[in-house]
Curated annotation (Swiss-Prot):
A Pfam family reported for this protein in Swiss-Prot or TrEMBL: BPD_transp_1
Stored InterPro entries: ABC_transporter_permease, MetI-like, MetI-like_sf
Keywords tagged on the record: Cell membrane, Membrane, Transmembrane, Transmembrane helix, Transport
Role played: Probably part of a binding-protein-dependent transport system starch degradation products. Probably responsible for the translocation of the substrate across the membrane.
Entry membrane topology: Multi-pass membrane protein
Gene Ontology cellular component list: plasma membrane
GO biological process, one term: transmembrane transport
Organism taxonomic ancestry: Bacteria, Bacillati, Bacillota, Clostridia, Thermoanaerobacterales
Ranges where the ABC transmembrane type-1 domain occurs: 71-281
Transmembrane stretches, start-end: 15-35, 77-97, 110-130, 156-176, 205-225, 260-280
Name of protein: Probable starch degradation products transport system permease protein AmyD
Cellular location(s): Cell membrane
Protein family (similarity comment): Belongs to the binding-protein-dependent transport system permease family. MalFG subfamily.
Amino acid sequence: MAKKAKFFKNGIWYWLFIAPTLLSLIIVVLIPFIIGIYYSFTDWNGINQPVFIGLKNFMTLRDDAEFWNSIIFTAKFAVACIVIINVVGLSLAMLVTRKIFARNFMRTAFYLPNLIGGLILGFIWNFIFVDVFQTISDATHIGWLGGWLSTTNTGFWGLVIVTSWQMIGYVMVIYIAYIESIPTDLIEASKIDGANSWQQFRNVVFPLIAPAFTVSLFITLSNSFKLFDQNLSLTAGAPGNTTQMITLNIYQTAFSAQEMAVGQAKAVIMFLIIAVISVIQVYLTQKREVEM
């Protein structure tokens, strides 16, 4: 009885400690999520009383070419960001974990862009791409520097550059944590066996930091699909909504066109896409970790 009473008493304290976080999660995330799913099956403009209409909102999305184009654009953007952010982030992590001069300063410098808000970052880079690059182009007659963000292609790579510049430092920190946890004995043993730098990385380092790769891949994937503020402040979908990502398309549908229910239906589709891709990605990468 004494053990049960002690367990019950401790259990109450556990629940008391997690209750604020759990309550916040339910109020801020779970309840709005459920309400949002309900609204996706209604005719609602954000003001009038919602009227249940079943799958009509989802059926209308079949003919919404702009929405599907935004999904394709977002998918291409996500692939580019995943590759660039993880490759560069891992490379920088390998660099700053070596015994080199000013490595702590370099860690700070590489991480700093992550502390800047996405909206502000977009406006800063918009000024750089549009004004600074154009000035340099006029002075040096380098044609490709002019007209940035004026085409779909330059707008796409502008978004990739800005997002990568912001997130590389964050991913670098994740890789650093795993790299520094690798026992130095393993590295020394591989050197004694005659392994070169690439062989050490491929056969010793990478298998041990595979969990970091899983985490970083998931973060970059989800953040790339959910990106909104940089898209709004950098290109705003221009030219002609060809650089419009799925989140910006949802925003414009819900708030600019006052079609809240249709926008919510798009958000549900976006959630399903991210959920399916994330589950597959985590499953495959964890399976790869076991094989390593």
